Amino acid sequence: MGEVVVILKIMPESPDVDLEKLQADIRAKVSGIEDMKVEPIGFGLSAIKIAMITEDDEGAGDKIEGLFSQIPGIDRTEIESLNRLL
């Protein structure tokens, strides 16, 4: 196998979610995160964009989405891209 870089968009449950605390919770529970930033969406809502490196296993995308769904304050997780590292 190899490694893949995954770009994710994390949507909080509401505009009232403390994004700094949510980022800290994500870093505490998920390994392999290379970059994380807040991106304004509109109407007072922001998303968290994450770049992470993980093993290229079958079903890796589903595993990643499942991992983030267990963190309180997250409404949904979208994988924007998944690319194999050379």
UniProtKB/Swiss-Prot annotation:
Protein biosynthesis listed as a keyword: yes
Keywords: Elongation factor, Protein biosynthesis
Pfam family, one: EF1_GNE
GO molecular function: translation elongation factor activity
DNA-binding found in the keyword field: no
Listed SMART domains: EF1_GNE
Family: Belongs to the EF-1-beta/EF-1-delta family.
PANTHER family recorded: ELONGATION FACTOR 1-BETA
HAMAP family in the cross-refs: EF1_beta
Primary role: Promotes the exchange of GDP for GTP in EF-1-alpha/GDP, thus allowing the regeneration of EF-1-alpha/GTP that could then be used to form the ternary complex EF-1-alpha/GTP/AAtRNA.
Record protein name field: Elongation factor 1-beta
Gene name per UniProt: ef1b
